[in-house]
Design a protein with these regions (language model features):
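Surface-exposed, charge/polar-rich loops and edge strands
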Residues: 1-168
Length: 168
């Protein structure tokens, strides 16, 4: 069932005015003014909104660090829409290859998919920064063509011990 909600004003403006930035529960506190700036990454993109949280694996990176990495190797970016499920604890009990996580959306551009596929074809290594990125790349791998597929997609995979990596 779909519910449509209409607002008298721009939803992004409304969220900025009355919303509160979600931060990881392990910080053990409410969001602070400083978090709006600090809890961003060098990969933040105001043109592609949609994340409920920053991909925390890259919080320590700054522009200078990223430039050094780009001088040493090829870098491609994908768009991650980190979902609210990232704040949920794992369910108690057995975790196995059938376990599914919360679903998160991502977008891989054609140029990023081409770079990744060329790297794989030439027996190069693909390094993922963070588990959300890793889940996206592994989910985007097509078993038939053995290529990473570009475009908007989503993932709910849970990578656990014994997982056979196809991209990274």
């Amino acid at each position: 069932e779909t519910v449509e909600i209409e607002f008298d004003q721009d939803i992004e403006k409304l969220c900025a005015e009355i919303g509160q930035m979600p931060i990881p529960p392990y910080l053990g506190r409410e969001a602070e003014e400083l978090d709006v700036e600090r809890y961003q990454t060098v990969f933040a993109n105001d043109e592609r909104l949609g994340s409920a949280a920053a991909p925390t694996a890259s919080l320590h990176m700054d522009d200078e660090f990223l430039k050094k990495v780009e001088q040493a190797t090829q870098v491609c970016k994908i768009n991650l829409n980190v979902g609210y499920g990232t704040f949920e604890p794992l369910a108690d009990g057995l975790i196995d290859s059938a376990t599914k996580l919360h679903e998160e959306d991502y977008y891989i551009s054609t140029s990023s998919a081409d770079l990744i596929n060329n790297t794989l074809e030439n027996k190069g290594k693909v390094l993922s920064v963070g588990t959300t990125t890793l889940r996206a790349l592994e989910s985007a791998f097509d078993q038939k063509s053995h290529k990473v597929i570009s475009g908007p997609q989503s993932t709910d995979i849970f990578i656990s011990p014994g997982y056979k990596f196809k991209v990274c």
